[in-house]
């Protein structure tokens, strides 16, 4: 891959970055499409829902820096910053598209620098998602990636080789997330309607979430809360489900997985199956729910309806423990509206430390909301757009301090924007 960069300027030059592996190929077909949604009609207003009135701002919070194009020419579906690195360490992120996972550094002075590119041995693989962790013994950065083939690859970034391969899901994997504190725990959501919890240190599947009252269609998005004791999931069945891990059974299974040895044990690991979520609702969205993340005790979720919804289970005054599993009621806190994004598998970026959300649309534009913790409905919204950014924006990621915003597109481009120095987030 070349290291050509596009620098700041009013008339940016186009630049392509290649992986240097011409043997890897990509075939577009309907089975790997991430675009079609069941309805292209605009979202209808529903009773009790409050629209967020964004406060006007004089200029965009972020300024264009550079963009590159990966030479596979295919959709890039996923992007993730390594937020585990220290404040003084380089800002590193990875992209997932075609059968490749590409790692870049964002130098402080601007631009993008290629660090590594991993090409899956299966040329038919299409990666949809990636997530960062590190080896608990060596502290080497690890990158998990998965997609169309339903196989999770855990890659040692420095060695540029897979050190773990996890097979269990029957179909494609749509999202991966690592536990915020126990970084050997990896969560995966799949087209097979199930969520799995893995231990990448002992290479076992700890739990399967799904079944009797689980998702009825593809699981599209998953997330741990900041404490790591709850999971939220969403899917094609229009539902959002919450799963608690703070039970004696889960504590025991997680501890057991840390010491379990497949070589020494004559029996397989006793994977637990949780058929019943601790909360479930279909009252928030009327279409595929393709992105969900925790915001403290609130949940941010979106569908193909031109709005990100901030909500919580039960009534506003209720704690999660007071909400019964049989109660599907929920409270809408705020909505963040945008335009021209009515296809599925378009995922927003959220920086919980700096309270900023960003989402792209089908026209290559990006909406950025700077949240006011004292007034969730009074978010500042600005729009980012470069004349050369015209393809669907699939996912957005922020650096830990939110100084850099990166997004990836259907035309194989990767875009970097820098926070303006005068902007306070």
UniProtKB/Swiss-Prot annotation:
Widely expressed. One of its GO terms (molecular function) is identical protein binding. One of its GO terms (cellular component) is nucleus. It comes from the Eukaryota. Its main location: nucleus. WD repeats lie at residues 71-114, 126-165, 168-208, 214-253, 284-321, 340-379, 388-424. Residues 1-64 are annotated as: Disordered. Residues 11-20 have a biased composition (Acidic residues). Gene3D superfamilies: YVTN repeat-like/Quinoprotein amine dehydrogenase. The keyword Transcription regulation applies. The keyword Transcription regulation applies. The modification Phosphoserine is found at residue 15. One of its GO terms (biological process) is facultative heterochromatin formation. Residues 21-42 have a biased composition (Low complexity). It is found in: Nucleus. Residues 43-60 have a biased composition (Basic residues). Changing residue 64 to F: In esc1; induces homeotic transformation. Residues 1-10 have a biased composition (Basic and acidic residues). Keywords: Chromatin regulator, Developmental protein, Nucleus, Phosphoprotein, Repeat, Repressor, Transcription, Transcription regulation, WD repeat. It holds the Pfam family WD40. Polycomb group (PcG) protein. While PcG proteins are generally required to maintain the transcriptionally repressive state of homeotic genes throughout development, this protein is specifically required during the first 6 hours of embryogenesis to establish the repressed state. Component of the Esc/E(z) complex, which methylates 'Lys-9' and 'Lys-27' residues of histone H3, leading to transcriptional repression of the affected target gene. PANTHER family: POLYCOMB PROTEIN. Belongs to the WD repeat ESC family. This is Polycomb protein esc. It comes from Drosophila melanogaster (Fruit fly).
